[in-house]
């Protein structure tokens, strides 16, 4: 028994959609044989050619994937969306390098003090260093890469569509500095009120300990997507980034804003 389903697309209707989304040319189409999908029908790999070893290579590919978790009985869970493979390892490394070689700064918080909105350093609440991505070319690549992978899920899971990206920020939580972000919400000031969902995309999970996200309104559970994977959640949820206890945690952050206001 195969550990996965096999579908035959005789009329090539489904294949055409995948080819178009992947940007594959007409010349390349002739060599395409098999699309390898995950449980959510996202393309993991494309196998080409007619070699005899193709079936064996497919079995090997699926066998080397991270093992599926055993079913767990869930009684309490935060209403969040965990998504793997939003960015590939080279892009994760590129973003970390940008932070290391670029001009990063102490992160600030935006809040309402009295009747005024104030943006300031507030180390009792947040302590980390940020690098804001200003390169239009890289912004476009991230928007297209992440957007096409995450937009269908936002629509399917939360019935949320028609968003626009906020800025992209590469952040670093350093254990030697004792970095953290205390419990907070992401949409409590006038300039952040149209933030609908937040995305935290981990870049180097294998290189640090700690730094998980928690959502205290929904139990003590800790959330940590693998490198290249992200977690999406409503900006109205109370959440916290726990201190990194060893190493440095790098992550890419952005928000999905509604379309009823201009970009802040």
Predicted regions and their residues:
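Chalcogenol-based redox active-site neighborhoods
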Residues: 1-65
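Structural recognition of the beta-strand scaffold that forms the well-ordered cores
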Residues: 6, 231-232
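Fe(II)/2-oxoglutarate oxygenase catalytic core
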Residues: 39, 56-198, 202-230, 236-264
């Amino acid at each position: 028994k195969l550990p996965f389903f096999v579908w035959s697309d005789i009329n090539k209707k489904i294949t055409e959609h995948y080819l178009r989304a992947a940007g594959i040319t007409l010349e390349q189409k002739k060599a395409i044989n098999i699309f390898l999908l995950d449980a959510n029908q996202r393309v993991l790999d494309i196998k080409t050619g007619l070699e005899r070893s193709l079936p064996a290579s497919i079995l090997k590919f699926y066998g080397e994937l991270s093992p599926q978790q055993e079913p767990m009985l869930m009684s309490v869970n935060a209403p969040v969306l965990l998504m793997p493979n939003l960015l590939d390892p080279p892009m994760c490394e590129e973003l970390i390098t940008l932070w290391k070689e670029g001009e990063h700064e102490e992160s600030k918080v935006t809040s309402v003090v009295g009747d005024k909105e104030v943006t300031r350093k507030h180390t009792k609440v947040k302590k980390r260093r940020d690098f804001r991505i200003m390169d239009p070319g890289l912004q476009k690549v991230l928007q297209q890469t992440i957007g096409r992978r995450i937009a269908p899920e936002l629509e399917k899971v939360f019935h949320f569509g028609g968003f626009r990206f906020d800025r992209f920020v590469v952040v670093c939580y350093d254990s030697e500095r004792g970095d953290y972000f205390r419990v907070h919400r992401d949409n409590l000031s006038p300039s952040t009120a149209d933030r609908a969902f937040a995305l935290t995309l981990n870049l180097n999970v294998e290189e640090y300990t700690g730094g998980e996200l928690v959502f205290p309104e929904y139990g003590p559970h800790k959330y940590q997507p693998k490198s290249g994977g992200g977690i999406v959640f409503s900006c109205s949820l109370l959440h916290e980034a726990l201190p990194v206890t060893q190493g440095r945690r790098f992550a890419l952050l952005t928000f999905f804003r509604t379309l009823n206001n201009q970009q802040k």
